[in-house]
A protein has these predicted regions:
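Structural marker of alpha-solenoid helical repeat scaffolds
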Residues: 45-47, 76-80, 115-119, 153, ...
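Alpha-helical adaptor scaffolds
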Residues: 97, 113-187
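Residue-level recognition of tetratricopeptide repeat
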Residues: 27-28, 55, 94, 132, ...
Length: 244
């Protein structure tokens, strides 16, 4: 359920790109459908093409390479005093998370949020990603603060509510966990990860019937995905239950 902050750029129809910004935007557009080709185009743009190179590398699952490219784009944008710098830092953080480097992700997301230019959903997604990095590095209290902010700015994102519910359960706050997983279910009941966590929370609260029902749904929705397999494993505890 990893999601990159989109670069909202499009080439004007029928008009060949001429300015550096137009060339970058055209490259980013190409990267969404032809990442390998866009990577080659990005190299011809030099420093101005780092953001496109990041999108292109992410599209080829080279997340560490993408993070490095987005970091370069962010630094270049800062030097040029461009408003996109914070967006690039946020994308670098997201890519570092995908690459499995939570410490570098946190540093990039710190820079993104410190800029003060992210707003609304983009800011919420940055708080969400930083919370993920904080959980990965063991700072649960700071993650709680960021998830509270994420669920305000990115309230329509079920992942924000899912992670908030999961963290609440891990911290022993079951009332909060129940409230937040209900919000996630409202937005994405067909997500096996959401159903899995709903079962985990119900089990922690001693609600075996609810846990069993949620885990069964998770296993049905995605039997071959990690969430579905985890749900199937959780259901084995009911194997001897005649009510199963």
């Amino acid at each position: 359920m990893i999601q990159f902050l989109a670069l909202l750029a499009a080439q004007a129809a029928g008009t060949p790109p001429t300015s550096p910004t137009q060339k970058l935007d055209a490259c980013v557009t190409q990267a969404r459908t032809d990442p390998a080709g866009a990577e080659q185009v990005a190299r011809t743009l030099g420093r101005a093409g780092e953001a496109c190179r990041g999108v292109a590398l992410a599209g080829q699952d080279d997340f560490a390479g993408a993070a490095t490219a987005f970091t370069a784009a962010a630094r270049n944008a800062e030097l040029a005093k461009e408003a996109r710098a914070a967006d690039y830092w946020a994308q670098a953080g997201n890519a570092w998370l995908a690459a499995g480097d939570a410490a570098k992700a946190r540093a990039a997301l710190d820079a993104a949020l410190a800029a003060g230019t992210l707003t609304d959903l983009n800011r919420g997604e940055a708080y969400l990603d930083r919370a993920r990095a904080l959980v990965a590095t063991g700072d649960m209290k700071a993650a709680r603060v960021d998830l509270d902010l994420a669920t305000k700015d990115a309230a329509d994102d079920p992942l924000a509510w899912l992670l908030s519910a999961t963290l609440a359960r891990r911290m022993g706050d079951l009332p909060r966990a129940k409230l937040d997983i209900a919000q996630a279910l409202r937005r994405s009941a067909d997500d096996a990860s959401v159903q899995l966590e709903a079962g985990n929370i119900a089990a922690a609260a001693g609600e075996a019937d609810r846990a069993q029902a949620a885990w069964k749904e998770a296993a049905r929705l995605a039997p071959d995905a990690p969430a579905g397999r985890s749900a199937t494993n959780a259901l084995t505890q009911f194997a001897g239950d005649p009510k199963k």
